[in-house]
């Protein structure tokens, strides 16, 4: 049994399969998920696990070279916007409809229990060297 890091076997396995340039959407409980991407649904109850908890856990294990969020996050969810600013000062902001469209090409979607709007970020995987 693993003793640290991401313990969810499905999520840990999906992370191990990611390569350079693959995209991962970390999303709130309300984000529409199109058919296509592999989905790991971690939502348990409204707010659990939170967007911040899941994002922090993923960032401990992923190399990220790009991140995209909906521009609407700034007004609708300042706490989540501030979290993304800390992790990704170079964050790309696009209209929410464009973020939803890009989700169709994601390799992986990790759905959280987050119940605040626009708590979504599309991560582009980098390489560790």
UniProtKB/Swiss-Prot annotation:
Pathway: Carbohydrate metabolism; D-ribose degradation; D-ribose 5-phosphate from beta-D-ribopyranose: step 1/2. It comes from the Bacteria. It holds the Pfam family RbsD_FucU. The active site is at 20 (proton donor). It catalyses: beta-D-ribopyranose = beta-D-ribofuranose. GO terms for molecular function: D-ribose pyranase activity; intramolecular lyase activity; monosaccharide binding. GO terms for biological process: D-ribose catabolic process. The keyword Nucleotidyltransferase does not apply. It is found in: Cytoplasm. GO terms for cellular component: cytosol. Its EC number is 5.4.99.62. Keywords: Carbohydrate metabolism, Cytoplasm, Isomerase. Substrate binds at residues 28, 96, 118-120. It is an enzyme of class 5 (isomerase). Homodecamer. NCBIfam families: PRK11797.1 (NF008761). Catalyzes the interconversion of beta-pyran and beta-furan forms of D-ribose. Belongs to the RbsD / FucU family. RbsD subfamily. PANTHER family: D-RIBOSE PYRANASE (PTHR37831:SF1). This is D-ribose pyranase 2. It comes from Streptomyces griseus subsp. griseus (strain JCM 4626 / CBS 651.72 / NBRC 13350 / KCC S-0626 / ISP 5235). The lineage of its organism: Bacteria, Bacillati, Actinomycetota, Actinomycetes, Kitasatosporales.
């Amino acid at each position: 049994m693993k003793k640290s890091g991401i313990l969810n076997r499905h999520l840990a396995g999906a992370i191990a399969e990611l390569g350079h340039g693959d995209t991962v959407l970390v999303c709130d409980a309300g984000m529409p998920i199109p058919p296509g991407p592999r989905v790991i649904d971690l939502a348990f109850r409204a707010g659990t696990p939170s967007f911040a908890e899941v994002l922090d856990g993923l960032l401990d294990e992923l190399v990220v070279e790009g991140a995209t969020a909906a521009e609407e996050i700034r007004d609708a969810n300042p706490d989540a916007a501030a979290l993304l600013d800390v992790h990704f000062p170079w964050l790309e902001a696009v209209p929410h409809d464009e973020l939803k469209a890009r989700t169709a090409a994601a390799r992986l979607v990790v759905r959280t229990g987050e119940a605040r709007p626009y708590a979504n970020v599309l991560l582009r995987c980098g390489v560790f060297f």
